[in-house]
């Protein structure tokens, strides 16, 4: 009578036009898939936002010198004499006055109270030397003033200020036995440094009785071969046992580790929800077929084939899944995109970042929804195509 394609189109249009008469079954299928897509997008946007923050940290022309074998600043250590050897090594750029562009630094963990949680969390307190400001990409003092060397004063990153109490410029905050004055707030283009507090490295040494020691030496290298030249010079020096990193690569590697951990925790949850969404779609489509059994039987009796009937039912499931996916993605976009949070990074301090719901992520969410709709619609489609026409018509 009709070609199978024409029959499928006609049946699919009929099925979709009847959806307003079946709001319950449609809502069950869509809500389950929307929940799946929302959680899926939420997990991925968390990992994406963290990676964006970490990947935006660091400069290709800045080298980090850590003790050999150290994968984080916390487990690195230099004496003051070793830091001076590094400071004057070949391959390091010099400023207009001929001084090496180097900042020997300390990375310390202190506790601050979260604004939303009201509980203490680890925050990075970094001691820097005067050159440390200029070595940071996109550094800008946004409010107040920089700390005065030799005093117990801090400048705080925008992210740290937004997440923790007591970090407004002009306020004082106590870490251990020492009270610090917050003198200003800085920005670094949304990088991980905005989660830190900065002070004079010599004051930090004194406050925690750390002696004349440092954990990392940050240096701007001289030209494209500067880092290689620095690495070779330090490797040949018997007084040192160090690794030389590109600052950008160092933070990029840290981002991969933490993002993988987030995905490893979140994706199994998404998979479990996906299984639940498949069953929700199955139930909804079976209920739809049961409610329209006589209608489908009549269509079969007047000449519509089994294959177009099955395909039209499958298309209905996919359309419902698509609508649920769009709904879930929309909820994720409006609720999570740009949402600020913090997590414990490999440095054992809180890193503040914004969730990033990207177009690529939304596309992956829609694809996941369509897969669920396809899987959830196969068996109901087969049932619709194989139902006994005579049995259904007897009920008329």
Task: Specify the residue positions occupied by each region the protein language model found.
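Hydrophobic secondary-structure segments that place a key small or acidic residue at a functional site
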Residues: 102-109, 119-131, 136-203, 210
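Hydrophobic alpha-helical transmembrane segments of multi-pass inner-membrane transport and secretion
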Residues: 23-50, 259-295, 318-327, 371-375
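C-terminal membrane-exit region of the final transmembrane helix in multipass inner-membrane proteins
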Residues: 358-396
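Peri-transmembrane interface segments
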Residues: 46, 50-53, 189, 223-279, ...
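Short juxtamembrane loops and helix-capping segments at transmembrane helix boundaries
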Residues: 336-363
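N-terminal Sec/SRP start-transfer signal
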Residues: 1-38
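Hydrophobic, regular-secondary-structure patches
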Residues: 38-124, 143-145, 150, 229-236, ...
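Transmembrane alpha-helical interface segments in multi-pass membrane proteins
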Residues: 286, 291-340, 364-372, 380
